[in-house]
């Protein structure tokens, strides 16, 4: 019985610490840590025009022109220094974003790039959304 209680306590502690860690990361983004859209469209550089802006509580976005329809663009949300805790990529192996459909993301994603293939050339809004239980990325056609 003690073993069962110990196992349950361990699971609860680990679950709480990972949830707390996720909130710490969200709070850092909210409180001034600067993220950029970094990828094929920026030559993987942290360019000022691709700085992610907070658009509402726990929601961040940036617009980017994608000039080639049908081309797969690889990208991440990351700070200028590629700090692991501020390096967001896909949480699902080899998953691709579809227009207007959220995809889970995670920090500490060293090689897990996000990817999106637009059906038409144009300006798109890339969003990082912390409002739900787990963070997601979303791409919309900009208005």
Regions found by a protein language model. Name each.
Residues 12-15:
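C-terminal motif of bacterial Sec signal peptides marking the signal peptidase cleavage site
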Residues 71-73, 124:
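Exposed beta-strand face motif in extracellular beta-rich ectodomains
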Residues 27-70, 80-106:
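Aromatic-rich carbohydrate-binding modules that target alpha-glucans
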Residues 17-20:
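Bacterial signal peptide processing site
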